[in-house]
Amino acid sequence: MCPARSLLLVATLVLLDYLSLARNLSVATPGPEMFPCLHHSQNLLKAASNTLQKARQILEFYPCTSEEIDHEDITKDKTSTVEACLPLELIKNESCLNSRETSVITKGSCLASRKTSFMMALCLRSIYEDLQIYQVEFKTMNAKLLMDPKRQIFLDQNILGVIDELMQALNFNSETVPQKSSLEEPDFYKTKIRLCILLHAFRIRAVTIDRVMSYLNAS
């Protein structure tokens, strides 16, 4: 058995390093089906980076830098992108993957090369679910920010648009995640701090998604 925390940490580091190397070294021609997803993932990363930079500039007197915020992964225990998107070259017969999806479908066995198409589908579905979770969070937060009399900051339609475009390109049918609502009076200071936290986390996930798409496109 592999300890869950150690596996997740190692898997994350190995995945990002491997996918970065694969993207830099690969000279393969983009496939017609994957290319739109790669294009959309690049737009996603650009929008995530620009939105975070803009937020840090506007909220310069708030704790909004990477060193100041409390990092949070809102997809934790909901999706398994890191595990599902591990390159098959790194998955050996003796490897252990403690994810809900793989343990159920492979019935506890370790993954083999015949699982290539299945693992790709699982990876892309997990990415879709990540985007869906962030989409709901951002829309909920934007609704609160638009209530702020100061109108200091709110999310523009660009980042929400590129999230939707990549989700459409992935084309998975999934249950609609209900948008959160609250009857409480919003605390705009806390909302802006949470915006910073989510934008930092989303940019990290956008980096992962872009590298995964680059790797899959070149495979």
From Swiss-Prot:
Subcellular location: Secreted
Alphabetized UniProt keyword annotations: Cytokine, Disulfide bond, Glycoprotein, Growth factor, Secreted, Signal
GO terms of biological process kind: immune response
Signal sequence, renumbered to the chain: 1-22
SUPFAM superfamilies for this protein: 4-helical cytokines (SSF47266)
Glycosylated residues (UniProt): 24, 93
InterPro entries: 4_helix_cytokine-like_core, IL-12, IL-12_alpha
GO molecular function: cytokine activity; growth factor activity; interleukin-12 receptor binding
Cellular compartments per GO CC: extracellular space
Cystine bridges: 37-110, 64-196, 85-123
One Pfam family matching this protein: IL12
Family according to the record: Belongs to the IL-6 superfamily.
Subunit note: Heterodimer with IL12B; disulfide-linked. This heterodimer is known as interleukin IL-12. Heterodimer with EBI3/IL27B; not disulfide-linked. This heterodimer is known as interleukin IL-35. Interacts with NBR1; this interaction promotes IL-12 secretion.
Reported function: Heterodimerizes with IL12B to form the IL-12 cytokine or with EBI3/IL27B to form the IL-35 cytokine. IL-12 is primarily produced by professional antigen-presenting cells (APCs) such as B-cells and dendritic cells (DCs) as well as macrophages and granulocytes and regulates T-cell and natural killer-cell responses, induces the production of interferon-gamma (IFN-gamma), favors the differentiation of T-helper 1 (Th1) cells and is an important link between innate resistance and adaptive immunity.
Protein name, as recorded: Interleukin-12 subunit alpha
Species assigned in the record: Papio anubis (Olive baboon)
